[in-house]
A protein has these predicted regions:
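Short alpha-helical segments that sit at the start of domains
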Residues: 1-17
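Short, locally clustered residues in the helix-turn-helix/winged-helix DNA-binding domain
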Residues: 16-23, 86
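Short acidic, hydrophobic short linear motifs in intrinsically disordered regions
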Residues: 24-37
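Short amphipathic alpha-helical interaction segments
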Residues: 40-55
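A short, conserved structural fragment
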Residues: 54-66
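Minor-groove-contacting beta-hairpin "wing" of winged helix-turn-helix DNA-binding domains
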Residues: 66-74
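Short, amphipathic alpha-helical interaction segments positioned at domain boundaries
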Residues: 76-90
Length: 90
């Protein structure tokens, strides 16, 4: 199982990848397998990151059997958070 720092990093990487791939459009999503392969996150850690982010209402997840994300999308709150972080960085 991942350490706390790794889990936090996975969550940030998922949010960033979603925001960049969808250009902040909540109607678009990314297949979970593509997200896992692109980010090279272990399957169980990706599932844990998605579960956490969905619980925070930052993403929505359509699940496949076996706790594998089928499709992952940003919510309005997720977009707002990513835009606020982008503004802070300048």
């Amino acid at each position: 199982m991942a350490t706390l720092r790794e889990r936090q990093g996975y969550r940030e990487r998922v949010l960033t990848a979603l925001y960049e791939a969808t250009e902040g459009n909540r109607l678009l999503g990314i297949p979970g397998r593509k997200l896992r392969n692109d980010l090279r996150i272990p399957e169980e850690d990706l599932a844990a990151a998605c579960t956490y982010l969905a619980g925070e209402e930052l993403i929505t997840v359509d699940w496949e059997p076996g706790n594998t994300p089928a499709m992952v999308s940003l919510t309005h709150q997720g977009i707002r958070r990513m835009e606020a972080e982008k503004e802070e960085r300048g």
